[in-house]
């Protein structure tokens, strides 16, 4: 005995109508994809407190908090700029004023490679549909 709900029937109708629409990952709807594609590159981040941090991106989370390794912290608040070397640092997104990406980095190719990685990982976890059994006579 199968019970169908109206909600399920509506969802089925909506899925068939929207099957032609192109799927866009949530990461590509924000700047998150840019910074995750830049993982492993060296950038300069200026904070709201007028400090500059130069380091290598190791991780970026969904809230755009950036983790840098081998970072050099320059405090421009004082007359004599003091440089500090930090092994790892986590920068909260609310403290970032702007991020300087080097000119030598081609963002188009990086984003293209990153989108290929996402699609490959998506295919890896996608379920395959079973073939229907052959008809019996």
UniProtKB/Swiss-Prot annotation:
Residue span, Sm domain: 30-105
Source organism, top-level taxon: Eukaryota
InterPro entries on file: LSM_dom_sf, Sm, Sm_dom_euk/arc, U7_snRNA_Sm-like
Gene Ontology terms, MF aspect: histone pre-mRNA DCP binding; U7 snRNA binding
Pfam families registered for this protein in UniProt: LSM
Gene3D superfamilies: 2.30.30.100
Cellular component GO terms, alphabetical: cytoplasmic U snRNP body; nuclear body
GO biological process, one term: mRNA 3'-end processing by stem-loop binding and cleavage
Protein name in the entry: Putative uncharacterized protein DDB_G0291015
Annotated source species: Dictyostelium discoideum (Social amoeba)
